[in-house]
A protein has these predicted regions:
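Active-site mouth loops of central-metabolism enzymes
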Residues: 80-91, 159-164, 206-210
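His/Asp/Glu-enriched, well-ordered alpha-helical/loop segment
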Residues: 249-258, 276-287, 293-378
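Metal-associated gating/positioning segment near the N- to mid-region
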Residues: 64-123
Length: 399
């Protein structure tokens, strides 16, 4: 299969040219539009006057002039959507979420669990490991355990009854239940045994510092021990202070990748712009989406607690504590572009950088020979019009 566009994101810049792909990308040829195809205005190839007809020697080239072709997005921090939740351990709910993500330009995702009891986490991990994506759904690339190894003071919306000290053996049991696919663990390094946990657990997966009271020195010790990522920068951690720099400054000094919830509510837009300038290519956009994403206002279960969705904001019921976002990652990309981030940078922060953060950038996250042929066609308003996963059409919305 071949595809032409005048705006294909190759590396960090949009270029014109032709992509060749089947399940994997094979080559990108920059330059002019192939002469054997005509633009019908609908993103289709027209040969011999009839869409889909192919004359002798005609190339199978899809014409996406006027569309942005970007890598499939990679959401490494998303709990739930459309009434379904990864923590429920239900395959039908995983199918629902998978389709929602694909419809919104996400081709790979890390089902993200909450701070639950070990038996519940095991069941969720088993379900995630056995999940097989539908043809019109995004692939799960492994588990993100957001807890239970977090601190009480910065637990946010995590259930305090299930918080557990960092335990490597427990992580190994959960990883076994997940079929060896735990990709990311959020933990608080200042808790009992935290640094020793980081040293051992980082051999299995990416360790992220989050839901933590860690000061600068403790955070740096954790980064030196093997941590390399930060969960939702600015949220559920101590704020930066000119004499108490804390985790945020440590993450910058250590060259860690850092998540940013991109709904414009968790972090004010001017601070988001500052974070982009500070972290650059180490910035990771995430949705941190909840069960009520895509659902009507009301109350919803969440990790053994209840959350309330009102006016586009989800909070722990009866409190002002933000529980997570109610947007897709693609909607987050649109918002940060509106806030002033260049489109190419926003897409990189939602594709190649998260793939690198979970050690999967050899396979997903960018348009490059040998990688999975996951890509999204966006119109000029950044709406998803087509999604390909493993080189096959998964979503089409061109009307």
């Amino acid at each position: 299969m071949k595809l032409y566009s005048d705006h294909i994101l190759i590396g960090s810049a949009f270029q014109s040219g032709t992509l060749e792909f089947d399940e994997r990308f094979s080559i990108f040829t920059p330059g002019m539009k192939p002469s054997s195809m005509q633009n019908t205005g609908s993103g289709c190839t027209e040969e011999n006057g009839r869409p889909g007809a192919r004359g002798k020697g005609a190339e199978d080239v899809l014409d996406y002039s006027g569309f942005y072709i970007i890598p499939g997005l990679v959401d490494i921090h998303t709990h739930a959507a459309m009434g379904a939740d990864a923590s429920d351990g239900d395959d039908a709910e995983m199918q629902t979420m998978s389709r929602f993500y694909a419809q919104n330009g996400v081709t790979s995702w890390c089902p993200t669990t909450m701070t639950l009891k070990e038996p519940e986490l095991k069941e969720a991990c088993r379900t995630i490991s056995h999940f097989r994506r539908p043809e019109d759904g995004a692939r799960s690339v492994g588990v993100h355990l957001e807890g239970p190894f977090v601190c009480m003071e910065k637990r946010g919306a995590q259930n305090p009854e299930n918080i557990h000290v960092p335990d490597v053996e427990m992580l190994k049991r959960l990883n076994e239940a997940a079929g060896g696919t735990v990709r990311l663990v959020t933990m608080a390094p200042e808790t009992e045994g935290g640094i020793a946990f980081v040293r051992e657990a980082s051999k299995l997966c990416t360790i992220s510092l989050g839901h933590t009271m860690a000061d600068y020195d403790t955070a740096m010790r954790a980064f030196f021990a093997g941590a390399s990522h930060v969960t939702h920068l600015f949220n559920a951690m101590q704020p930066i202070h000119h004499r108490k720099p804390g985790l945020i400054a440590a993450a910058y000094d250590a060259g860690a990748t850092a998540e940013l919830i991109c709904d414009g509510m968790h972090v004010e837009p001017s601070v988001m712009r500052m974070a982009e300038k500070l972290f650059g290519r180490n910035l990771v956009l995430v949705s941190d989406s909840l069960r009520c994403t895509g659902m009507p206002e009301g109350d919803y279960p969440f990790g053994g607690q209840m959350i309330t969705l009102r006016n586009g904001r989800a909070t722990l019921k009866g409190t002002d504590t933000i529980a997570g976002s109610v947007i897709s990652l693609m909607e987050g990309v649109r918002r940060v572009v509106d806030f002033g981030m260049p489109l190419a940078d926003a897409v990189l922060a939602a594709s190649s950088t998260p793939a690198r953060a979970i050690r999967m950038d050899h396979e997903i996250g960018s348009i490059r020979a040998g990688k999975r042929a996951d890509m999204v066609a966006l119109d000029k308003s950044l709406k998803v019009r087509k999604v390909w996963i493993d080189g096959r059409e998964a979503v089409s919305s061109e009307s």
